[in-house]
């Protein structure tokens, strides 16, 4: 077998050669970022020219992927949609079983943005390919010329819903360990792991990956994140997350940085209860936000909001449903892309009245896995009709999602999945482990 550095060069150079031009995820490796308490990204150019400024070129990229023109076209499109179409485009549904016809029918009939695939929806490789193909056809049958959100939790380690079908990668803590051992090599193997993960997922028909985890764990007292976190050190975590975002962008798949503003300090599990995080805003900025700031600098397309009770920010309200938390992300950190909730079927938000509607009104663009997808769709339709949520808010959310899916299709078309993607993924996984341990 070739030495680690030699095999790494083959993986990175080969995959990028096949993928075509460098695009938004490329550039020199980031140095270790400083811990910032202010916004770390520059807003993208406005699509509305002033009296003294020339019009913005529609090919100008936004700070999160799509071009200004793609976003404007998405806004024009959703402005023509019915409330039923709008409501669907802000929901990523859940389904039961492994029959591809079930989620395909949901996407077509409810106009869903897409679905989240879990291990319970997976039988084997052939079934996965049949399912993702059926979902793509369903969106096209619904009149959409952009792909649906077909997402999966494939973080590496034990949160990998395609176990036995896609290549197994180590926990994301390996990325932090690799960077701690050798910063430049660590960032490269992390980026290569994300690149090959994304390419392999695309080969299976997926358009989204619910990764990377940007939570900074506090160690043994953290029952939920643990080894899913890249590090207990905010600076190491920031480097790992930034490298992963570049890799996923290179692969032409939508990544999802999670769980804002950071679940690693919570001492209870949001799958079961609503955890309280008693950190002050200053503590959150210093400990939890650096990886998210790094992701935004690297043009992260989507950020997932956590179900946490931030007692010093929005007490008693899950972060995913708190306008103050969306303001922290958008106004303070400068994020302009798609915001998505954590699963709305989790115990942290169970029992709350109309949780999806609360999240949408607070600032969510995508509502992930509500308990009952059809009922949630109708709730949003009725809320638009009654004015409980403004049509403007739903159009804003839907347009971002449409623009991002348009970007994904464009980048994926430029970067075909190589025939030897599985071999490359296995090599990248081995290299990450070797660099870490």
What are these regions (language model features)?
Residues 2-9, 14-109, 351-437:
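Preference for extracellular/luminal or secreted protein segments
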Residues 54-58, 85-90, 110-117, 177, ...:
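Acidic/histidine-rich, surface-exposed loop or edge segments in extracytoplasmic proteins
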Residues 88-95, 113-117, 148-154, 208-212, ...:
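Hydrophobic faces of well-ordered beta-strands that scaffold small-molecule active sites
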Residues 89-100, 172-189, 273-286, 345-349:
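Active-site mouth loops of central-metabolism enzymes
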Residues 136-170, 190-214, 237-261:
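Glycine-rich, aromatic-flanked loop segments that form ligand/cofactor-binding clefts
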């Amino acid at each position: 077998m070739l030495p680690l550095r030699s095999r790494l060069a083959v993986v990175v150079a080969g995959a990028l050669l096949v993928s075509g031009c460098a695009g938004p995820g490329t550039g020199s490796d980031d140095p270790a970022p400083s811990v910032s308490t202010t916004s770390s990204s520059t807003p993208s150019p406005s699509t509305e020219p002033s009296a003294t400024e020339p019009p913005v070129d529609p090919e100008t990229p936004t700070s999160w992927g799509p071009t200004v023109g793609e976003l404007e076209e998405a806004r024009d499109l959703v402005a023509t949609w019915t409330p039923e179409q709008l409501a669907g485009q802000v929901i990523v549904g859940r389904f039961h079983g492994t029959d591809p016809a079930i989620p395909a029918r949901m996407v077509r009939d409810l106009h869903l943005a897409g679905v989240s695939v879990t291990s319970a929806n997976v039988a084997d490789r052939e079934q996965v390919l049949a399912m993702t193909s059926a979902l793509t056809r369903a969106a096209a049958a619904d009149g959409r010329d952009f792909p649906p959100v077909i997402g999966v939790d494939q973080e590496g380690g034990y949160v990998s819903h395609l176990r036995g079908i896609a290549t197994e990668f180590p926990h994301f803590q390996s990325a932090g360990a690799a960077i701690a051992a050798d910063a430049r090599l660590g960032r490269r193997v992390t980026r290569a792991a994300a690149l090959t993960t994304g390419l392999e997922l695309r080969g299976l028909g997926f358009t989204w990956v619910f990764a990377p985890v940007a939570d900074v764990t506090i160690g043994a007292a953290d029952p939920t994140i643990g080894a899913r976190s890249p590090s207990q050190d905010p600076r190491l975590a920031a480097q790992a997350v930034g490298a992963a975002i570049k890799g996923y962008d290179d692969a032409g798949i939508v990544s999802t940085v999670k769980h804002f503003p950071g679940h690693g300090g919570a001492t209870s599990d949001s799958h079961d209860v609503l955890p309280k995080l008693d950190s002050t805003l200053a503590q959150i900025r210093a400990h939890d936000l650096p990886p998210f700031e790094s992701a935004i600098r690297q043009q992260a397309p989507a950020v997932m909001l956590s179900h946490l009770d931030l007692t010093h920010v929005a007490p008693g309200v899950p972060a995913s449903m708190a306008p103050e938390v969306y303001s922290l992300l958008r106004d303070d950190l400068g994020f302009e892309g798609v915001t998505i909730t954590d699963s709305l079927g989790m115990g942290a938000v169970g029992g709350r009245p109309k949780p999806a509607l609360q999240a949408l009104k607070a600032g969510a663009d995508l509502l992930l896995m509500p308990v009952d997808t059809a009922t949630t769709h109708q709730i949003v339709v009725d809320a638009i009709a009654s004015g409980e949520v403004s049509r403007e808010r739903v159009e804003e959310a839907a347009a971002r999602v449409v623009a991002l899916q348009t970007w994904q299709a464009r980048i994926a078309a430029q970067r075909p999945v190589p025939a030897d993607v599985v071999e490359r993924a296995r090599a990248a996984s081995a290299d990450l482990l070797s660099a870490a341990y």
